[in-house]
C-alpha cells in the first residue's frame, strides 16, 4: 500500500500518523537531489523549520524543549538542569559532533567509497592516506553512552542524548560514539517538517 520502504502513514480516520522519520535534518540533500533531476524542491514541497525541534515530556510533568536557536537552547537547558556545567557539557557534545562531521562528511556523505577509490568526483585522492585515521578520530571504536556519561551527569539530559542512537535503531550502550554527529546535525542544520507529514516526500 505504501510507496516508500521506510516511511509509512497508517490512519485512524480522520488522523494520519508518520511511522518512519518524523523530521528532516539535512534539507540541502533533498535540494541537491531535485536539482540533479533538473527540478526545484520548492516547486513540489514546502519545508517548515521547527522551533522547538522536539519536546520531551516525563511522567512527572517535567519538560524540555529542543529550541532551534543556540541562545534559546542554552537558556532552556539552564532552566531544565539548573546546572550551568550541564549546559556547557551539552555544548561539548555538540562540538564533538561537529568535529565528527568535519572529519567524515566529505568521505562518507559527499562521496561514495567507490568514488574515492576510483578518483571520481571532487574528492582529492591525495587526502586518502590521511583519512585512514578518521575511524579513530570520529569515535568509531568508542562507546556512545560512555562518551556522553563522561561529559553529562544530569540523568535526564543523558536520556535525551541517548535517544539519538535509537534514531538508527541502535542501543546507546552498544553504539559507536560516531553517532554523536546526529544531535549536531539536528541542531546545526535544523529540524524541518513537511506539511501533511514526511510521507508526502514519498
Predicted regions and their residues:
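Helical element adjacent to the flavin cofactor pocket in flavoenzyme catalytic cores
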Residues: 181-202
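Acidic surface patches and DE-rich sequence motifs
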Residues: 4, 11, 58
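Active-site substrate-recognition segment that forms the wall
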Residues: 43, 172-177, 181
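N-terminal FAD cofactor-binding segment of flavoenzymes
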Residues: 7-53
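Rossmann-like flavin
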Residues: 56-176
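N-terminal Rossmann-like FAD-binding beta1-loop-alpha1 element of flavoenzymes
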Residues: 1
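A short glycine/serine-rich beta->alpha loop
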Residues: 12-16, 167-169, 190-192
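Short, glycine/acidic-rich beta->alpha junctions
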Residues: 26, 140, 197-201
Amino acid at each position: 500500500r505504501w510507496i516508500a520502504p521506510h516511511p509509512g502513514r497508517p490512519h485512524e480516520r480522520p488522523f494520519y500518523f508518520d511511522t518512519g522519520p518524523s523530521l528532516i535534518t539535512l534539507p540541502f540533500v533533498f535540494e541537491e537531489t531535485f536539482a540533479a533531476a533538473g527540478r526545484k524542491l520548492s516547486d513540489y514541497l514546502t519545508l517548515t523549520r521547527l522551533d522547538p525541534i522536539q519536546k520531551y515530556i516525563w511522567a512527572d510533568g517535567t519538560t524540555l524543549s529542543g529550541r532551534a536557536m543556540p541562545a534559546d537552547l542554552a537558556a532552556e537547558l539552564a532552566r531544565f538542569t539548573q546546572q550551568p556545567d550541564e549546559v556547557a557539557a551539552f555544548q561539548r557534545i555538540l562540538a564533538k559532533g561537529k568535529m565528527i562531521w568535519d572529519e567524515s562528511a566529505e568521505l562518507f556523505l559527499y562521496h561514495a567509497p567507490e568514488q574515492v577509490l576510483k578518483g571520481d568526483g571532487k574528492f582529492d585522492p591525495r587526502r586518502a592516506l590521511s583519512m585512514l585515521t578518521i575511524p579513530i578520530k570520529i569515535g568509531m571504536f568508542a562507546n556512545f553512552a560512555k562518551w556522553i556519561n563522561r561529559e553529562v551527569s544530569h540523568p535526564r539530559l543523558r536520556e535525551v542524548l541517548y535517544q539519538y542512537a535509537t534514531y538508527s535503531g541502535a542501543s546507546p550502550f552498544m553504539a559507536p560514539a560516531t553517532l554523536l554527529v546526529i544531535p549536531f546535525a539536528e541542531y546545526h542544520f535544523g529540524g524541518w517538517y513537511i506539511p501533511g507529514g514526511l510521507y508526502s516526500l514519498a
